[in-house]
Swiss-Prot record:
The keyword Coiled coil applies. In group A rotaviruses, VP4 defines the P serotype. It comes from Rotavirus A (isolate RVA/Cow/United States/VMRI/1988/G6P[5]). Disulfide bonds join C318-C380. Signal peptide: none annotated. This is Outer capsid protein VP4. Residues 65-224 are annotated as: Spike head. Residues 389-409 are annotated as: Hydrophobic. The keyword Cell membrane does not apply.
Amino acid sequence: MASLIYRQLLANSYAVDLSDEIQSVGSEKNQRVTVNPGPFAQTGYAPVNWGPGEVNDSTVVQPVLDGPYQPASFDLPVGNWMLLAPTGPGVVVEGTDNSGRWLSVILIEPGVTSETRTYTMFGSSKQVLVSNASDTKWKFVEMMKTAVDGDYAEWGTLLSDTKLYGMMKYGERLFIYEGETPNATTKGYIVTNYASVEVRPYSDFYIISRSQESACTEYINNGLPPIQNTRNVVPVAISSRSIEPRRVQANEDIVVSKTSLWKEMQYNRDIIIRFRFDNSIIKSGGLAYKWAEISFKAANYQYNYMKDGEEVTAHTTCSVNGVNDFSFNGGSLPTDFAISRYEVIKENSYVYVDYWDDSQTFRNMVYVRSLAANLNDVMCSGGDYSFALPAGQWPVMKGGAATLHTAGVTLSTQFTDYVSLNSLRFRFRLAVEEPSFTITRTRVSKLYGLPAANPNGGREYYEVAGRFSLISLVPSNDDYQAPIMNSVTVRQDLERRLNELREEFNNLSQEIAVSQLIDLAMLPLDMFSMFSGIEGTVNAPQSMATNVMRKFKSSKLASSVSMLTDSLSDAASSIARSTSIRSIGSAASAWANISEQTQDAVNEVATISSQVSQISGKLRLKEITTPTEGMNFDDISAAVLKAKIDRSIQVDPNALPDVITEASEKFIRNRAYRVIDGDESFEAGTGGRFFANKVETLEEMPFNIEKFADLVTHSPVISAIIDFKTLKNLNDNYGITREQAFNLLRSNPKVLRGFIDPNNPIIKNRIEQLIMQCRL
């Protein structure tokens, strides 16, 4: 009935030969938009528009107009214009070096005939004869004396319709504006001790740097910009310029909010990212004159650097997306040089760099918001690659360059089925640069981009410096670590009783190798995987930290695992496929006697029927039950297991119900099955949920339950490991081919195992940390 199904499952493999067409999907495309994120740097999140978290910037932006400030006596900084904006007639400003110059500037309104007025200048009253013949412009008059008890004399005037006046100390002179607007110009007076000249303004004023003198002259002649003439601009005390600036730390932790159990921490960090490209160069068979492929592949790089006085170990994975395929064919003869395909990244490409280090920031980076980053640009230039021909001069691919500009940052996950590490994925867009790349002794020349032949150009790595900021939700007690959002195995382990976990991990931590932990995590998520998986761990000093494994080891089942696995496979082959899923009119309970529900199937094979009768009343198993619209789907695995258990006579029947019950309820409670028909995929989960999607576009489609039932009867059934939501996230973030989608849909074991690199120090260290957390 379901031989192909269970031969695949019991062999600890999910690969199913769907058709030759599926195997060749994607091979005819000339241009790929895909990404190979490497063996342990997969993204578990879709692209997200994160909030604008605070990022400190060291760039100094000097405004043209600094102010307005309230009138107050102060030491005017050398090389800065003081732009005064009086509102009425009278003394505008006073300045003196207390030795040879006493300057007082008075303002006279338009249309004043010659008259004597009294002004208070430097604390004493003086009578001054003033006049202003202009009917429209205001008149600034500079009154100067050279001795303390001397008389004031008029030194210069400024006729202004903007009512603005300027003064600056620079180059042993005191500069002011004279003439008539809109053609007023500067004039300097030699001052003996100009640096110590103290200025006392009597109106609001602004400070303008000498480098912006042209703007100051523009304001004197034509007036302030409109925004300075609104009621919303309020002058402040000049003492505010003397406030000691707080030096911001490059790396700082800020408590945003805090409760008894949790707190929000903002981490501002500087960062040094080092990465390198990797490539794959494959030669074609024959006379060694032809190359099949030159392509990019994910590259890992580990390094140490000092961050805020602490040495951190960082790990990066560099991958590319949106590659452009080129080719060169020098002729049809076997000795003609040719490259079937070589990849180049250009403006339409992206470079992804996944970054993780062992600092405190990444230990608690689980619940994150307000993620932002500022990074420098980096130029990547290619080197030379010589195509070693058996005879003749060698063609050389040389040149090519591209600049990487930061295009955003998201969370990514470096994970296995046992642990998941949240890391940062920095996304870079490309801009092509000089020089172009060429292949000498061929027609290929003046092409732009970075080819995959030698993308590092002889360098060990490329380096990018910058800063990032994020707000993370962490436990209030710094000794605790935030629970990690892991995949199925870890999540189910955490659901068990804490005391059992501590006891098991205390016993296992020094005796179980990391590779064995990974093997357990990689077990297929179906009931039969326990039988094939226990064979590799039954001789371990301790069980694998689960009650299920302990029960298997303590029972007689461990001694006959191999035979039982073969028996189950044979039994699955013996049952006719036509009854794999049946329409049950009455809502039959999954706890009902399985021998009654599968009697039709059992009767087809007499030997199986005789074995079923021996334990038909003892084994009651809760398996997949998916009720919908009056129809129940019972997983055929229950009948297969029941039919063949009795073939292993030495197995204690009393141990099996406990083992299978706990396995089905706890160890493998999250499960789904999938059937693929052409470009359509149907999926049924244990929770009574159904999905149907298009493989090509990953779009959801209506679920045809009749077609699903027919397909399950006549098609291979695959245990679904990667759900469609994850597939869609991968496609949105990278763009995956139809062939890659099929490999993930059918749970190809090579693809799944590609997620794990046991030699990766990040994963190894994280597993050890997880074990240490569970110790007493």
